[in-house]
Structures are given as C-alpha cells and as structure tokens.
Amino acid sequence: WHINPLLISIVDIEINSDFQNQIESYNDQYILSSFQDHVVAGGVFSFEYNGQNLSYNSNSLYFKTTFESAGGTLFNFHELISKPKNPNTNSYDFLGIRYAHFQKATIDLRYYQGLSDRSKIIYRIYSGIGIPKKNLSNALPFEKSFFAGGSNSLRAWRARSLGPGSYYDSANRYDKIGDIKFEGNLETRFPI
C-alpha cells in the first residue's frame, strides 16, 4: 500500500514575449503545455502486489492499481466561501495560478510465464481513465494525460507517437495524448 495524502506541484514560469512567440511558432502542444502555469494539489493512493520470482523458469504475477485525485478540496472550499473566479480563465486560482481538478485511476496487470531457465513471456494489460472536473473541465493537465509508446509502454515506438488512427501531419508535431488508455502487449525476454 502506498498513500500520499498531499502532493503539491506548482509551475509558475515568467516568460518574456520573445520566448513566448518562439515556442508558439513551433506549433507543438507538448512544448506549449510544458510552459503553462498551473498547480496540481491532491493525493495518491496505490496498491501493488509483486509476486515475481528471480528464477526464469517460474510463473508470477504483478498487479498495481492507483487512484489520484486533485483540486477537489480547493474547489469545494472556493465554492463554500463564494470566491470569485478568474474572469480570463473562468476558473478558480490558488496563489494566483489556475489549479487542476481531476480524478484518475489506473490498473497495471502483468503475468510472467517461464519458458526455460533463460527465457520468459510477459503478458501485460494497462488501463486507465482520467476525468477532468469543474475547475478545468475540458482535459487533464498535460503531464497527467495518458500516452502510448516509450520505455514504460510499447517500447518499439517513441513516447506519444501512437494514437488514434495513423494520422500524421508533417506541418505540426502531433502528440497523441488522451484521458483514456487501454494497452495490451506481449513480450518475450531471452538472452542475446
């Protein structure tokens, strides 16, 4: 069990207009989102079971589920005291910065099947959903969004390069992120 009742992440960047124009010219949502001010204040609860055995010739199970909630306490407090919303963003601020408001849950299930004393097959299913709430109701914060590809996902693809369909826009960098993820893969591990 892992319980972290309070996690606070504050991003407050002072950007001069030349730099702002430069990052906007890239037309890259990943870069633009990396330089937006925001606060994530919430907690995380997770349960992890690891029955892995170092022996290659054995079968084992790994399971982890995580639940994360952010912004709910702040939002309810601001509603209770009738704090006025920021007219530019139509949202509440914390320390003058807009804060995220969401709930997110994930499940990671892996089964390790021993084939011999030097090889295994790993079956993996990963699923998650994030639900944006009232203060930022259109999407999860960029760093909390789901994506496929990369070292902790489907390793043969770059991070954020897999997504709906096979759309590729050569004029823009199209990062494929979302609020829902369902991923399954099969991997064979053996010495080279």
Which ranges hold each PLM region?
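C-terminal outer-membrane beta-barrel translocator/porin domains of Gram-negative envelope proteins
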Residues: 2-192
